[in-house]
Amino acid sequence: MEQTYQYAWIIPFLPLPVPMLIGLGLLLFPTATKSLRRMWSFQSVLLLSIVMIFSMNLSIQQINSSYVYQYVWSWIINNDFSLEFGYLIDPLTSIMLILITTVGIMVLIYSDNYMSHDHGYLRFFAYMSFFSTSMLGLVTSSNLIQIYIFWELVGICSYLLIGFWFTRPVAAKACQKAFVTNRVGDFGLLLGILGFYWITGSFEFRDLFQIFNNLISNNEVNFLFVTLCAILLFAGAIAKSAQFPLHVWLPDAMEGPTPISALIHAATMVAAGIFLVARLMPLFIVIPHIMNFISLIGIITVFLGATLALAQKDIKRGLAYSTMSQLGYMMLALGMGSYRSALFHLITHAYSKALLFLGSGSVIHSMETLVGYCPKKSQNMVLMGGLTKHLPITKNSFLLGTLSLCGIPPLACFWSKDEILNDSWLYSPIFGIIAWSTAGLTAFYMCRIYLLTFEGHLNVHFQNYSGKRNTPFYSISLWGKEGSKISNKNFSLVTLLKMKKNPRPSFFSNNKVYKIDENVRNMIQPFLSIPHFGNTKTYSYPYESDNTMLFPILILILFTLFVGFLGIPFNQDVDILSKWLNPSINLLHQNSNNSIDWYEFSKDAFFSVSIASFGIFIAFFLYKPVYSSFQNLEFLNTFVKMGPNRIFYDKIKNSIYDWSYNRGYIDAFYGRFLTAGIRKLANFAHFFDRRIIDAIPNGVGLMSFFGAEVIKSVGGGRISSYLFFYFSYVAIFLLIYYFFNV
């Protein structure tokens, strides 16, 4: 066992040869490297698989013995200061290693096909491997200095991948937004690290916690200063994990390739903030009010993320706000002291959200065969619908991910979210009400995304690709579907109802292609050439993705089905997660053995499932396929006859829609007051620098120039000039003498 831990230092460096070799290959042998580019995906998967096997071995040993291993190398700069570098293997590290490697491998396999026709294929895999290296280094760090170094490397990789298609102005702007927003949090993190070093004199976690606890117990610290330093540390996690108010970068980060969205949202960048707070829990729990502040930020993010997801039309942005809300649940659990529940939800959410993002990538991939490469169209749920027949495997996997996130048993997120909801009641009734209400909102917006994407008819056939309407009946329902007031006499309602029964080509058959224009592709392929933005070749119907993309989705289905059983709290003997985290930090249940009886569990589960079911019912009520509503005209007429009540209902609905679709006006507020204010300040500083600061030396130079010109004209060699200036000076001196002696 000791030997296994001794070689754990190699874990972060195993994926590193891939970006280094790709860079050397492009520099020395560019043609050969590009022609053999597909082999780099195999090497990336192979190296990360080795890390996964190593991590599983460490995790098994952690479960059996709860052994904490730390190794440190000391670099002595002088007698008073030294830097220590090392690695720390404990239950938290082993959990994160498993998460990063398993999700990372699935994303890499998926990306091999998804990015196969992209000119940036090599660059993508170089970034991804370096991303894995940075995240693995972060979770194995033994001190705050290493944490900060790898923290910045994780951020750099995220910015590179968010702005991967940097020739698109929207992607470049999203990259810049993520960078600027995270700069705020990272600066706070750096100040917090320096503050605690000034207090304790150490960066090492073990020494830092021990010294700080002694100072707190002896009342030898300034609590105001300590609280400020703790908030600054937490600011880094706020930005990285997209917590309010530094959450604005996360939806725009969807401009990157879909595989990287899956990795960022499941196991890397946003998980880094949760990991940091979990790692520093022994520090935070002894500081008054800081845990309350963490839970407050968490509950605000929970509710805000859920409300902003209600009316999004972009499928990836809807999932992004879902991630924001679920991260809020994790932060809420950490703030309440439910260490185990937070990490449990981090695990279950990672696999469910990776499944949803890879499923959305499959949907986007299929929609690109209809509308060409244009994210505003291929990711727009307005143009989707009716994909159940064409993408059955993707549909079933997306449904499982949706139900898991809704909290439906026995799927993964049910077990973890239920613990957080129960703990929220013990912590604060107000927080409990908000958390339980948000669980219903989660079920609503996730079911909405599923219904708009897979149920009903393929709405791209109801309007052209430029967005111009050619029929008034392309709207499924409110929120996400525009209605049309233009009447079309040639359109028959009976025709619309019969469209459901018309046969459509199956994705299993490639013998026939149904053209919708003359630019149909000559060869059916499961991927597009991303760099060809002008490509207008389309098919009439989407089809299922290639097996290389479906394989990771199927594996993630297994994780979504069974990973929740790791933390079932019925019996201590089968509760693997509690053994893994023993001794865990749980302020709400300090004397608990993390096991509950059947009656208590059934009561709480019934309540949570009822709320989730209510949200699902409302979503089905509002977003069921359009033809089912048309077939029940009497049901529709009841809403028409509502009169004034309907007007009031529409006002409420539109207000909620505007709030959600406009991102709670938070981005607009930042743009108008912060961004505009900073730009005005920058313009004023520019004006002051150029017109005042620069004007002083420039004015002296001009005065010297004109003075020299005058002197030069005097000494021009003409006697008349000499006489003129001579008599002028004599006259001036005489006048001065006269006035002073009068």
Swiss-Prot record:
Keywords: Chloroplast, Membrane, NAD, NADP, Plastid, Plastoquinone, Quinone, Thylakoid, Translocase, Transmembrane, Transmembrane helix, Transport. It holds the Pfam family Proton_antipo_C. The chain crosses the membrane at residues 9-29, 40-60, 89-109, 125-145, 147-167, 185-205, 219-239, 258-278, 283-303, 327-347, 354-374, 396-416, 425-445, 550-570, 606-626, 722-742. It is a multi-pass membrane protein. Its EC number is 7.1.1.-. One of its GO terms (cellular component) is chloroplast thylakoid membrane. GO terms for biological process: ATP synthesis coupled electron transport. It comes from the Eukaryota. One of its GO terms (molecular function) is NADH dehydrogenase (ubiquinone) activity. It is found in: Plastid, Chloroplast thylakoid membrane. InterPro entries: NADH_UbQ_OxRdtase_chlpt_su5_C, NADHpl_OxRdtase_5_subgr, ND/Mrp_TM, NU5C-like, Proton_antipo_N. The keyword NADP applies. It catalyses: a plastoquinone + NADH + (n+1) H(+)(in) = a plastoquinol + NAD(+) + n H(+)(out); a plastoquinone + NADPH + (n+1) H(+)(in) = a plastoquinol + NADP(+) + n H(+)(out). Belongs to the complex I subunit 5 family. NDH shuttles electrons from NAD(P)H:plastoquinone, via FMN and iron-sulfur (Fe-S) centers, to quinones in the photosynthetic chain and possibly in a chloroplast respiratory chain. The immediate electron acceptor for the enzyme in this species is believed to be plastoquinone. Couples the redox reaction to proton translocation, and thus conserves the redox energy in a proton gradient. NDH is composed of at least 16 different subunits, 5 of which are encoded in the nucleus. This is NAD(P)H-quinone oxidoreductase subunit 5, chloroplastic. The gene is ndhF.
